[in-house]
UniProtKB/Swiss-Prot annotation:
This is Protein Rev. The RNA-binding motif binds to the RRE, a 240 bp stem-and-loop structure present in incompletely spliced viral pre-mRNAs. This region also contains the NLS which mediates nuclear localization via KPNB1 binding and, when the N-terminal sequence is present, nucleolar targeting. These overlapping functions prevent Rev bound to RRE from undesirable return to the nucleus. When Rev binds the RRE, the NLS becomes masked while the NES remains accessible. The leucine-rich NES mediates binding to human XPO1. Residues 36-48 have a biased composition (Basic residues). Residues 23-48, 89-115 are annotated as: Disordered. GO terms for molecular function: DNA-binding transcription factor activity; RNA binding. Signal peptide: none annotated. It comes from the Viruses. It comes from Human immunodeficiency virus type 1 group M subtype B (isolate MN) (HIV-1). Homomultimer; when bound to the RRE. Multimeric assembly is essential for activity and may involve XPO1. Binds to human KPNB1, XPO1, TNPO1, RANBP5 and IPO7. Interacts with the viral Integrase. Interacts with human KHDRBS1. Interacts with human NAP1; this interaction decreases Rev multimerization and stimulates its activity. Interacts with human DEAD-box helicases DDX3 and DDX24; these interactions may serve for viral RNA export to the cytoplasm and packaging, respectively. One of its GO terms (cellular component) is host cell cytoplasm. Pfam families: REV. Residues 18-26 are annotated as: Homomultimerization.
Length: 115
């Protein structure tokens, strides 16, 4: 791993193997049985997954001294926009964050209506 010493690489690999083992110890539930039984198995599986996720975060923070999630990306104070002055295609939207509904020409809309 670039920029790290060999010792911390070994520790990181050991930690990743441990976390991988935790996730592998909780396979997805089977799809057999009644709807209620399947629902209960999925609910218990999701609860175990949440528990494994919290244990993994604890392992990462305590043994490696780093948070489980990366540090959030700091965005510039001004809004990010895309310049659509060039050909942007015919997707029916313009710009970012302001979806436009693609409107068909009136002749197409009128062809199927009876007045």
């Amino acid at each position: 791993m670039a920029g790290r010493s060999g010792d911390s690489d070994e520790e990181l690999l050991k930690t990743v193997r441990l976390i991988k083992f935790l996730y592998q110890s909780n396979p997805p539930p089977s799809s057999e049985g009644t709807r209620q039984a399947r629902r209960n198995r999925r609910r218990r599986w999701r609860e175990r997954q949440r528990h494994i996720r919290s244990i993994s975060a604890w392992i990462l923070s305590n043994y490696l001294g780093r948070p489980a999630e990366p540090v959030p990306l700091q965005l510039p104070p001004q809004r990010l926009t895309l310049d659509c002055s060039e050909d942007c295609g015919t997707s029916g939207t313009q710009g970012v964050g302001s979806p436009q509904i693609l409107v068909e020409s009136p002749t197409v809309l009128e062809s199927g209506t009876k007045e």
